[in-house]
Curated annotation (Swiss-Prot):
Coiled coil: none annotated. Belongs to the purine/pyrimidine phosphoribosyltransferase family. This is Adenine phosphoribosyltransferase. The lineage of its organism: Bacteria, Pseudomonadati, Pseudomonadota, Gammaproteobacteria, Alteromonadales. It comes from Shewanella sp. (strain MR-7). It is found in: Cytoplasm. Pathway: Purine metabolism; AMP biosynthesis via salvage pathway; AMP from adenine: step 1/1.
Amino acid sequence: MAMNTETLSLIKQSIKTIPNYPKEGILFRDVTSLLENAVAYKATIDLLVEQYRNKGFTKIVGTEARGFLFGAPLALELGIGFVPVRKPGKLPRATISQSYELEYGHDSLEIHTDAITANDKVLVVDDLLATGGTIEATVKLIRQLGGEVQDAAFVISLPDLGGEARLTALGLELVKLCEFEGE
């Protein structure tokens, strides 16, 4: 589905770039500036609703923490459930865990064991796609619980970091509202 270029431009322009954060040589794409702009934030959610309405999804899974900011309102608008994937020890019921590689080590994510069933068709939502490690771990969690996941949506993609190729290799169809070059 083609997206309105004027709206996409508004969204992209609302994302501030912070040079040398969190370290020298990095251009940090600050999605919180988009959240501060009510018109751009609503336009973001509206575009995602337009993209995914009537596609048969039963759940949206958002990754900690900024995935919650886009996934939860999208789920509400689509009239489906929202499932948070969190860092270890943050969810109160029984969970399963999936580790993933970081630049300097490992981390892991958890999901409630009863949050996804074999009857669920799941859309994964996050603010930013960089290397794809957190979303790959999230997809593995969903599939381990029997859920069907073939789609992921991002506000920002940094294609130079390899995440798009990593996730398409998992069989995911990706929607990215904005792309930025570099790191």
